[in-house]
Structure formats: C-alpha cells, structure tokens
C-alpha cells in the first residue's frame, strides 16, 4: 500500500496564471473605459439650499454671481439656467436688485423657448406666435396659460432659484405647474 497522499496540485499552472492576469487587465481596461461614459450620462448633483433652491448657472453650468447681473441697466432681463436646467429670465429692478419672481422661458403652448423683445416689452414665441407680457401673462394665443414662475433670491452674491408653490399673483389661482 502506498503511504503517500494523493493530493491535487495546489500550485497554479503557468496557463492559469496568464489567464488570470489577462482577465484582470481586460476588466481594468473595461472599467476605465466605462467610467467616463457613465459620468457623461449622469447629471452632476445640484447644490441646493435649505428651501430646495438651486444656484442660477450660465449656459455652460457655472454659477452666476449676482453682481454680474446687477451691474446691468434696470429692466434688463438676464437668461440663466434655473431649476432642472430650465431657461429662466431674471429681471433687474429700478432699485438695482433682482425681481423676486423669475419667469421660465418655455412657451405653455408647445414648450418652445423664446426671446424677450425689449421694443415691444413682450416675450414673443417664434413657433406659433404666442405673446406674453412682462410678467408672463398671455397677451395673445395659441397659448392659454401664463408662463411658469420661480422664486429668485440673492444670498452672498449667489442667485438661488426655487420652486413657486404659492398662489400665482397674476391669476389669483393655484399655479398650473404645481
């Protein structure tokens, strides 16, 4: 009888070692390639204040200092990226402050974006001809609802935009967007 124990070979063969390292290199390369792609498709986390507001940003995503907008003439409308990146108009008031009510730049007819016309003192939608006054109320259709409002607040030279949940001051009713 043979007294030697019949053991499996505990050491790894050269082929197994090379397969292991090849798999590890492929996994590391795939992870390195997938990471930037997932970062591209995932939006960055918004910085919010205690009321759930977000910082006003320019078109490339940098926060806009309030002082940059407040140096403009009264009545100027600045277009910024507000809640969920929605284009939002901010207005410089006569006293050199920002109007606490911002107007979201999406037509309530079909969602087109539009410019402020300083000559006519209107928002004019180029898609189907809707017209809105300086406060965002409908002056001419086909749109039948006023423009969405947001709260605007300046804290430490930063502009914070937050959702408007209260009664719409233009209609005296509950906002349609809530």
Curated annotation (Swiss-Prot):
Keyword Translocase in record: yes
Swiss-Prot/TrEMBL cofactor(s): [2Fe-2S] cluster
GO molecular function: 2 iron, 2 sulfur cluster binding; electron transporter, transferring electrons within cytochrome b6/f complex of photosystem II activity; metal ion binding; monooxygenase activity; oxidoreductase activity, acting on paired donors, with incorporation or reduction of molecular oxygen; plastoquinol--plastocyanin reductase activity
Pfam family, one: TM_PetC
GO-annotated cellular components: plasma membrane-derived thylakoid membrane
Family annotation (InterPro entries): Cyt_b6_f_Rieske, Rieske_2Fe-2S, Rieske_2Fe-2S_sf, Rieske_Fe-S_prot, Rieske_Fe-S_prot_C, TAT_signal
Residue pairs linked by disulfide bridges in the UniProt entry: 112-127
Reaction catalyzed: 2 oxidized [plastocyanin] + a plastoquinol + 2 H(+)(in) = 2 reduced [plastocyanin] + a plastoquinone + 4 H(+)(out)
Cofactor: binding details: Binds 1 [2Fe-2S] cluster per subunit.
EC number: 7.1.1.6
Alphabetized UniProt keyword annotations: 2Fe-2S, Disulfide bond, Electron transport, Iron, Iron-sulfur, Membrane, Metal-binding, Thylakoid, Translocase, Transmembrane, Transmembrane helix, Transport
Annotated Rieske domain residues: 61-161
Subunit-level organization: The 4 large subunits of the cytochrome b6-f complex are cytochrome b6, subunit IV (17 kDa polypeptide, PetD), cytochrome f and the Rieske protein, while the 4 small subunits are PetG, PetL, PetM and PetN. The complex functions as a dimer.
UniProt name for this protein: Cytochrome b6-f complex iron-sulfur subunit 2
Organism: Trichormus variabilis (strain ATCC 29413 / PCC 7937)
Species classification: Bacteria, Bacillati, Cyanobacteriota, Cyanophyceae, Nostocales
């Amino acid at each position: 009888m043979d007294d030697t124990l019949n053991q499996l070979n505990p050491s790894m063969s050269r082929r197994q070692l090379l397969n292991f390292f090849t798999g590890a290199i492929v996994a590391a390369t795939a992870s390195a390639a997938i990471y930037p792609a997932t970062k591209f498709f995932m939006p960055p986390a918004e910085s919010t204040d205690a009321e759930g507001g977000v910082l006003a940003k320019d078109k490339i995503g940098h926060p806009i200092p309030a002082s940059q907008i407040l140096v403009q003439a009264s009545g100027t409308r600045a277009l910024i990226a507000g809640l969920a990146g929605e284009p939002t108009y901010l207005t410089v008031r006569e006293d050199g402050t920002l109007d606490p009510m911002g107007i979201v730049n999406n037509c309530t007819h079909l969602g087109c974006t539009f410019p402020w016309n300083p000559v006519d003192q209107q928002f004019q939608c180029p898609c189907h001809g809707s017209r809105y006054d300086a406060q965002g109320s409908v002056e001419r259709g086909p749109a039948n609802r006023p423009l969405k409002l947001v709260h605007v607040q300046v804290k430490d030279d930063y502009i914070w935009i937050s959702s408007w949940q209260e009664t719409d001051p233009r209609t005296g009713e509950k906002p349609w967007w809530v």
